[in-house]
Design a protein with these regions (language model features):
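Short acidic N-proximal helix/loop "leader" segments that mark the beginning
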Residues: 1-12
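Short beta-edge strand/loop motif at the mouth of beta-sheet-based domains
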Residues: 12, 32-86
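Hydrophobic/aromatic beta-strand elements that line small-molecule binding cavities or substrate pockets
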Residues: 15, 86-93, 120-129
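Amphipathic alpha-helical segments
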Residues: 18-37
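A short, structured loop/turn motif at beta-sheet edges
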Residues: 21-22, 45-48, 92-100, 126-135
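Hydrophobic pocket/interface hotspot
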Residues: 24, 34, 52, 91, ...
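Short, solvent-exposed aromatic-acidic interface loops
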Residues: 103-110, 139-146
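A conserved amphipathic terminal alpha-helix motif
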Residues: 142-176
Length: 176
């Protein structure tokens, strides 16, 4: 895994997966498969313009999240532990076996996030066939629009989150 570009506005992760583009595409663009490696159960298929709702698999534990914040050197904050369904994302664009994107509130479980007013970030997945399998690039951008009091925390928590999710998708696809 490499991190080709990181700034204060953009997180980029890249990984080469030992699977054909068609397999990686299913893991990314099929809502059920996406949920399996990402840790959410989603309420339906990904459709451009549709807002997806999901529930966390397992327990979202405030103490564990605060501990993760400390390990990342992020100023700790309270956490809104979701009950029931939580808006996860609004699908932007789907280009089969090449590109998938959605918008969401970055680090949306932060107690200081205001879901009514918070600007969203754009999450993009780009797939490219390479000799070893598929190069997957994940970019999340738009952090400079996040309110200043949350920006650094949201960026660092999502930076750590994407590092973990790249490993999750690798294990999911390589093990399939």
């Amino acid at each position: 895994m490499t991190t080709p570009m990181t700034s204060t506005d953009r997180i980029e992760k890249q990984v080469t997966l030992r699977a054909p583009v068609s397999r990686v595409w299913r893991a990314i663009a099929d809502a059920q498969e996406f949920g399996r490696w990402f840790g959410f159960t989603l309420d339906g298929p990904f459709t451009p313009g549709k807002t997806m709702k999901g529930t966390f698999d397992g327990q979202v534990d405030e103490a564990a999240i605060i501990e993760a914040q400390k390990k990342m050197g992020v100023p700790t904050s309270g956490v809104k532990v979701p009950s029931g369904s939580t808006v996860l994302c609004t699908v932007e664009r789907i280009e089969p076996e090449r590109y998938f994107s959605f918008r969401w509130i970055p680090y949306g479980i932060d107690a200081e996030a205001d879901p009514e007013r918070e600007p969203t970030t754009l999450v993009e997945f780009t797939l490219e066939a390479v000799a070893e399998g598929t190069r997957l690039t994940i970019i999340e951008s738009g952090f400079d629009r996040v309110p200043a009091h949350r920006r650094a925390r949201a960026f660092r928590m999502n930076e750590g989150g994407w590092a973990a999710q790249v490993e999750n998708v690798r294990k999911y696809v390589d093990g399939a």
